[in-house]
Amino acid sequence: MQSIPKRSRSPRGSGELLAEEIISAASELLLEHGDDTAVSIRAVASRVGVTPPSIYLHFEDKDALLDAVCARYFEQLDGEFAAVADGVDDPLERALQMGIAYVRFATSTPVLYRIAFRQSAPGPSKVDEVLSASAFTRIATTVAELAAEGFYPESDVGEVVLELWAAAHGVASLMLAKPELPWGEDFRLAETLLRAVCLGRTTLGMLGLDTECDDLRTWLHAQHRSPDGSDGG
C-alpha cells in the first residue's frame, strides 16, 4: 500500500490554513470523480499530505467535511446574485434575475449541489449558515422592498423568500435529474416558470392568498380591458 508522504510540521496558528487545504482537497476529489464515493478521510489525507488523524482534528467525520465543502461552494452564490441584481432598480425584476442565477449556479456544478441538499444532519448545517448570512439576506431585502410597495404584508417576507427558493430549487433539481427534457436554450423554460412564480405571487399578495380561481380570472379580464370597456387586443 502506498504510504502517505510526510508533511512538514505546520507553524503555530496554521490550523485554519490546514483546514482550508483539506476542504480544497475534498472539493477536488468530488469534482474529479463526480460523486463522494472517492472522498474518504484517507484519500483526502493522502491528497493533502497528512495522516488521517490530522483530518479529524478539524472535521468530526466525512459528513462534516462534505458540509464544509458545500458551504464554501455556496459562499459563491451571493456573488452570483450580486452580478445580476446590482443596478436593477425594480425589486420584482431583481428577484426574478436572482432566481435564474440560482438555477444557473446549481446546474453548473451538479455534484456539489446534490451533495449540499443530501446532507441530513440534525440542526442547521454550515450550508444553512452561509446562505442565511449572505445570499438569502439579499433575497429577503428584495422581498422586503416588494412588501414596502404593498405587494405583500411585511409579516409574509420570510414565507415569500421560502416560496421563491422552493421554486428555484425545484426547477434546478428537476433539470439535474432529467437533463434530457426540452428545457430550451439559455434556461428559457426555467425563466418562464420563475417569472410566473414571481408575478403570480405578487398578484396573490395584493388580492389575497385565498383568492378563488374564478375571482382571479375576473380580475385578470378586467385588467386586460381597454379604457373604453372593449377587450384589449
What are these regions (language model features)?
Residues E21, E32-A64, A68:
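Helix-turn-helix
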Residues P124-E129, A133, A148-A196, L204-H224:
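Hydrophobic/aromatic-rich alpha-helical bundle segments in the mid-to-C-terminal region
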Residues R72-L96, V127-V130, A140, A144-A147:
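Amphipathic alpha-helical linker/stalk segments
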Residues A82-L112, F136, L164:
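Hydrophobic alpha-helical connector segments
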